[in-house]
Regions:
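Non-heme di-metal
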Residues: 1-209, 214-222, 226-228, 234
């Protein structure tokens, strides 16, 4: 259950319309690295996260991403509020206007509609947290790109705040990922087999209820590394 407060997480007070910049910023509403995809990613992943501490982090950050989406929508709304037909045509906002008038609709800067394919939820803690860390860096890069294009301090101020929060989220997911990796038990058995004429040693884990994901991850990395070295030596 969420409690909604009738205020933005960070103030958005834009006094000058700018539909050209609105078309850029809207990407952080419905683009591939936007806040809508981020919130859906984390709030979906939390159900199959095996560790309560990390589930809490996913819930916290997923909830905050909803607040960030609200901020982005407020920015776009204030940048396009009460536009005249002349302004809409002058700044190239006509294509969006035809389909949505001045309503908010999730799309990327290029006009691509939002899609659930922008995020994954795999049910494996390392896989999901790795995606989460990458997602936060991609969002941070997108905000960097926006700040390179925008000079208005009224717009830059909330965008900088959002960028800073992406860095904090990345750090929190990194800490969670390290905590997950520390739960991998020590190896107990060593299995040997040959490939490309080389002998490989694979140590497996036992006595852990999440053994399969970690075991498969370790096996994949080990086999790819060893086979790659073997193939290189035969060329």
């Amino acid at each position: 259950m969420w409690n909604y407060e009738k205020r933005l997480q960070y103030p958005v007070k834009i006094t000058r319309t700018n539909p050209k910049m609105a078309q850029v910023i809207i990407s952080q509403f419905g683009g591939p690295d936007g806040e809508l995809a981020a919130s859906m990613r984390y709030l979906s992943q939390r159900y199959t996260m095996p560790y309560k501490e990390v589930t809490g982090i996913l819930t916290d950050i997923g909830t905050e991403e909803l607040a960030h989406m609200e901020m982005i929508c407020a920015i776009v709304y204030q940048l396009t509020k009460d536009l005249t037909p002349e302004e809409i045509e002058k700044y190239g906002f006509d294509k969006y206007y035809v389909d949505h008038t001045l309503a908010l609709w999730p799309q990327a800067a290029a006009g691509t509609p939002w899609t659930a394919t922008y995020f994954q939820s795999k049910g494996d803690p390392i896989t999901d947290l790795s995606e989460d860390m990458a997602a936060e860096q991609k969002a941070r890069t997108t905000y960097d790109n926006i700040l390179r294009l925008i000079k208005d301090p009224e717009i830059c101020d909330p965008i900088r705040f959002l960028r800073e929060r992406e860095i904090v989220h990345y750090q929190r997911f990194g800490e969670a990922n390290r905590e997950d990796c520390s739960k991998i038990p020590k190896a107990r058995k060593t299995h040997k087999f040959s490939t490309f004429g080389k002998s490989l040693s694979i140590r497996t884990f036992a006595g852990h209820r999440h053994e399969p994901p970690y075991l498969l991850l370790y096996l994949k990395m080990k086999i790819i590394h060893e086979i790659g070295q073997a193939a290189f030596s035969y060329n």
